Structure formats: C-alpha cells, structure tokens
C-alpha cells in the first residue's frame, strides 16, 4: 500500500510532503494560522487626572499672634465698621481676619478626639469657673423672665427684650467680679459689649451665627487681655461653649427667637454653626462612631451629651415637627455620607470661612474695638445716623439708608433685602406650640412644590 493516505473529498494527504508531516499547524483553508498577538495594540486603561471633590483647599490654622500690651491700647466701645462692600473686602485681608481664624481653629484643634467627659471640674481654671457662673446666672435671668402669653403666636416673644436688658445691667458687675479689678473699666466695657450681643438681637428678637460668633469674640477678648490662656482652650470649648449652647437652647425655646438669616431647610442649622466644627474635631478619629451614626437614635441618645456634633443633631431632631434628617435637614443628611470625620471637619472649616466670615449679611453686624481692631481705611459709623447694634433693624447687604416712609434698610437701594421681607416664625416655635396643645405628630404630610 502507498505510504500516503488520502482523506477522500478533501484531497488533503498526510504524506511526507504535507504540512502535518512537517509539524506546521493546519487550518481549514490549509494555511498556517498567523500569530496576531503581536499585531493587536495592547489595551491599557486611560489614566484620567482625578479632580479633588472640592477644589477649595481646607483653610489652615494661622499661628496665634502675640497678645497686645493692655497699657498700649486705647479701649473703646466696639462699633460696626463694615458698612460698605469695600469695608468687608478690607476686613478679609486684615490681621483681624487672621486673628479670628486662628482663635476659632485653635479652639477646634484643642478638642480633637476629646469627649466632653474628659474635662473634670478639677481641670478648670478660675477664669473658666467664673465664666461658667456668668452663664448660670444668665440662665437664671431667663427663668426669672417668663414669656408673655401671645395667644399661640409663633413669633418672637417681646419679653426677650426685658431679659436682654437684665443681662446688660448685670454685665459690668459680672466682669468686675471675676476680673477682680485687674483691668480698667474701659477694658471691661469693651469686652462686655460682645457678651451683650451673644444672646440675640433686641429689636428683631432673632438669633443666628453672628450672635454665636460674638460669644466666641468675647472669649477672644478675654484671651487678648490675658484672662484666658491657651491651656484653657480645651475647657473653653467642652465646658464653656457647651454650657452656652444649653443656655441658648433654653432662650430660643422660651422666647421663640426667629432664625437670623436662616437658609431654611437648605441650611446647616437655623441657629448654630460652631457645634458642628468643634464636634467634628471631637470625632476626628473615633473608632466606631461614623458620620452615618447621626441617623441612629440610640447613638444620639447615648453619646449626644459627650460630643457636640451629635448633641446638636439630637436637638435639631427634637425641635422639628417632621421626622427624618432627609426632610428637615437635607444638608446634614448629605454630609453624613462622607467617608470619615476628617472630610467633615475640613468641610466645616471651609464653611466657617465662606458662610460666616465671608458673608456680608453676617459680618455687617460685627463689632470692632481695640482688642479686635478694624482695618485701616474701613468706614466709620456716624453715631448720629445709626442706633446701637442691638437696636438695629433687620440687616441687609451693602448700604444703610432710610426710605420715604422712614424705614431703615441695609442693602442696595435697588435690591430687596431681608429687612423688606415678611417675618417667618421658627420651626422651634411651631414645635413648642404643638407640644403645649398636646399635638405630638410622628409624621406630617409634606406638600409638593
């Protein structure tokens, strides 16, 4: 038999001269399969430059400047100096801006990873104890001045003005008691002006982040006067500021203070800002309390007394007539999706600069004296043209003027400021009135826009 074997119809043999005999691969067409591996370009993923989630850098903490020598200062009653847009721009580029930033951020850094319970009574200095006594007496004045019966009205209660008058009358006495005559009366007058503006506006019967800032500026004045030291910073936040929050919550609920400059549901909080900055620092590296924990009622109940952030969220929840952060505080709800507290703390630093110090409607009420000086070139307030800050009508944005009806406005003459709008009662007042009538709702229907 012939050594070659045919395949019949294909006619392809396996003899000596065939491709199979030579070891070459066979295709159906009888040709060698080409190696395409080297011809096809290698697939590589595109390397896109990752943009930061927030292009605005986290503000750093400036170094605290040296404190002034009190003997070189000419003490004065603090007054408003941000009357025009250019005044605000001068302030943002001034040493006082850096002074405020360094003081607030230094306070925040001092309480990193520290619960309130870590500060014992034995750790408190005498000035800190004296400040706590002042806050205790302020609370007592509030309880001694019960609100008038307004027939169920949810607007600010006018007895609040009587309460503020009592605080102002006691202010000099309080300072003289704990300063012990170490400072001249003019210094006491300057420092006490900030405390007087820390509990709300007498005319508008409202309260906002600007009043909260005034309380911190009062503490800054005491630091500038060497009454408080850097070693007191931790106690200042965790004991003094925490106590201030307790007193303010009582005042807000007693007199139905309206939120000053509130963003409504789209704001962080109707009244406060700093509990979120200081509170995020407290939780910076916490092992098990994550940002999502603010949705857990048991966590808020168990740890709210120890961490300012959680305590403020718990208070906000208690004052809303609709349950769920998603509905009444969507910004807090959004922030809770952050990966860690470091992200939140950095965001709160940005927000303090952008939403407090860089907001003209907030800073137009800021007071400048010798301890927190105005920048050179800023406008000077005419004492004959404007009343005191506590009697100032609702603030606006740029320019102070009176219209044809004699109403004072603080914004562009062609614009529409907060002073022109209809007063809106606080949600806190709504919740309190519901409780008084025994109407406790677990859920309210929310209308569509």
From Swiss-Prot:
CDD domains: PTPA (cd04087)
UniProt-annotated stretches for the region Disordered: 1-72, 378-416
Any one Gene Ontology cellular component term annotated for this protein: nucleus
Enzyme class: isomerase
Cellular compartment(s): Cytoplasm
Matching Pfam families: PTPA
Extent of Acidic residues compositional bias: 389-403
Pro residues bias (residue ranges): 54-69
Keyword tags: Cytoplasm, Isomerase, Rotamase
Record-level GO BP terms: mitotic spindle organization
Functional summary from the UniProt entry: PPIases accelerate the folding of proteins. It catalyzes the cis-trans isomerization of proline imidic peptide bonds in oligopeptides. Acts as a regulatory subunit for PP2A-like phosphatases modulating their activity or substrate specificity, probably by inducing a conformational change in the catalytic subunit, a direct target of the PPIase. Can reactivate inactive phosphatase PP2A-phosphatase methylesterase complexes (PP2Ai) in presence of ATP and Mg(2+) by dissociating the inactive form from the complex.
Protein name: Serine/threonine-protein phosphatase 2A activator 2
Organism lineage: Eukaryota, Fungi, Dikarya, Ascomycota, Pezizomycotina
């Amino acid at each position: 038999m012939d050594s070659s074997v045919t395949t019949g119809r294909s006619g392809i043999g396996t003899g000596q001269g065939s491709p199979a005999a030579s070891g070459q691969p066979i295709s159906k067409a009888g040709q060698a399969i080409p190696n395409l591996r080297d011809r096809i370009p290698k697939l590589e993923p595109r390397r896109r430059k990752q943009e930061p989630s927030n292009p605005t850098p986290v503000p750093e903490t400036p170094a605290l400047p040296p404190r002034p020598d009190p003997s070189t200062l000419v003490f004065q009653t603090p007054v408003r100096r941000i009357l025009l847009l250019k005044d605000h721009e001068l302030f943002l580029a001034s040493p006082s801006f850096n002074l405020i930033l360094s003081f607030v951020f230094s306070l925040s850094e001092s309480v990193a990873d520290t619960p309130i319970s870590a500060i014992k009574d034995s750790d408190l200095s005498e000035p800190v104890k004296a400040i706590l006594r002042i806050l205790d007496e302020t609370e007592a004045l509030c309880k001694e001045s019960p609100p008038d019966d307004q027939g169920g009205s949810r607007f600010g209660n006018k007895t609040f003005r009587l309460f503020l008058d009592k605080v102002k009358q006691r202010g000099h006495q309080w300072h003289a008691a704990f300063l012990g005559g170490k400072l001249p009366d003019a210094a006491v007058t300057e420092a006490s002006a900030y405390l007087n503006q820390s509990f709300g506006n007498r005319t508008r019967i409202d309260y906002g982040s600007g009043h909260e800032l005034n309380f911190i500026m009062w503490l800054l004045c005491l630091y500038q006067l060497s009454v408080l030291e850097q070693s007191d910073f931790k106690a200042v936040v965790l004991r003094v500021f925490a106590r201030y929050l307790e007193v303010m919550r009582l005042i807000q609920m007693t007199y139905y203070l309206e939120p000053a400059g509130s963003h409504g549901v789209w704001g962080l909080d109707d009244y406060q800002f700093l509990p979120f900055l200081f509170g995020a620092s407290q939780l910076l590296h916490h092992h098990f309390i994550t940002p999502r924990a603010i949705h857990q009622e048991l966590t808020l109940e168990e740890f709210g007394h120890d961490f300012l952030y959680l305590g403020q969220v718990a208070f906000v929840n208690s004052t809303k007539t609709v349950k769920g952060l998603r509905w009444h505080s969507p910004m807090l709800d959004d922030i809770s999706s952050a990966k860690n507290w470091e992200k939140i703390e950095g965001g709160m630093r940005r927000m303090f600069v952008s939403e407090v110090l860089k907001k003209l409607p907030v800073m137009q009420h800021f007071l400048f004296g010798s301890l927190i000086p105005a920048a050179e070139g800023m406008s000077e307030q005419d004492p004959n043209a404007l009343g005191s800050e506590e009697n100032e009508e609702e603030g606006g944005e740029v320019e102070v003027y009176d219209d044809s009806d004699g109403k004072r406005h603080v914004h562009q003459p062609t614009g529409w400021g907060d002073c022109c709008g209809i007063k809106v009662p606080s949600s806190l007042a709504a919740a309190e009135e519901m409780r008084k009538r025994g109407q406790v709702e677990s859920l309210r229907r929310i209308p569509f826009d």
